Amino acid sequence: MVVLLCAVAGQFGCEALRNSRGMQITYNYVKTADGVTLALRRYKPDQVAADRDPVILCHGLGYNLLFWDLADRTSLARYLAREGFDVWSLSLRGAYPSSQSLNSTLRKMSRFNLPPEMLKTLQKRLGDIRITNWSVDDHIQLDVPTAIAFVQAETGHKRVHWIGHSMGGMVMFAYLQDPSRARNAHSFVAVSVPMAVFHPLSEPLTFMHESENALRLGSKVVGSSAPAAVGTVLGDMGLPMDRLFYNGDNIDEGVLRGLFYLAQEEISPGQLGQLLAMVRSERFTSVDGQMDYTGGLCEVTTPTYLLAGTVDNLATVGAVQFAFRQINSTEKEYDLFGRVNGQRNDYGHDDIIIGRQAKAEVYPRIAAWLERFPCRPHESDMMLQPVVPSSAAAAEEEG
């Protein structure tokens, strides 16, 4: 197992450095109001289109910013950069290389996952490992506003495009319900985003619901490290929980192993508890129950493009269609990806971004949506008060 993990580590470590011609890739850091460090990986093309606002990519639950860049053939980050967009891939708190708990860091090391950026920043940010728990509310109220303000300041653009996968889209739907904040978003691309969970549950969600106590215990004892290590070596094991996250027939084994090795992160008790409550109640609410984010969808007026997969067992077709109907955006679109609409395969939760044909069938639709919303004249010239990053941007060397 150790030998295999080391071999896989070498393979993916090289892949991450390839194919960066035509763009500069850097890591950037900024602190939230409560002192947590957030990381953003910037893909700045040599020629940035003047009429395009920057794009922020936000991963889902249990992943990090590398979800968007596992390999060149499944990298939405590089695809959009080559289309002339200034792309910023965000890691929310708890995800590499943003602030992580000590347990997360140690568990990564135990499976020989030692990303170069983690090694470079670990000694400089020892205080960051003090965080032990966080909720989705923390992402909404602290992480998202900080990331957007940082990108605005660094680029001089008044607004950004936000592309969120799963939880990375849920936090944006919640953020957009505040009109004073919504003005910062030019458009929103919601990829496989469940803002409701309808009963009766799908078979994989039923398994998750019935295994709630075991999931809580497993999260505390071994976290994601054990399944990530096994998945790195064995790939698709066809387990019931796996069917929540991907269609095994629509994803290359090498990419899947890369997902487990590079992008898998720990899920905090707060995150897990909040999302398990959603499975029970059918609604996405704040931890204290005071905010009903599902009920607040009607407050969203930002231009929004919603994508769903025909065999997504987490963000089901019905759940995505529900969000589409509830939002009050005058400009909104919905696309369903699968054989029924001419795609070469049926799409699941993760493979709508990292699937075999996603680059050919999904990415162009996303780019076309973004191109519909050029920034207004002089809007990109509005320089905002700079946000001082917690450490200097580190340029990634080309391989």
Which sequence ranges carry the predicted segments?
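N-terminal cap/lid segment of alpha/beta-hydrolase-fold proteins
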Residues: 16-47
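Alpha/beta-hydrolase active-site loop
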Residues: 109-153
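Catalytic active-site module of serine/aspartate enzymes centered on a nucleophile-bearing elbow/loop
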Residues: 333-399
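Short beta-strand/loop motif that positions the catalytic acidic residue
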Residues: 300, 306-308, 312
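Short, surface-exposed "cap/lid" segments of acyl-processing enzymes
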Residues: 45-106
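Glycine-rich His-Gly loop
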Residues: 57-63, 165-166, 309-310
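Short alpha-helix in the alpha/beta-hydrolase fold that links the catalytic acid
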Residues: 302, 316-326
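Alpha/beta-hydrolase-fold enzymes
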Residues: 153-158, 163, 167-288
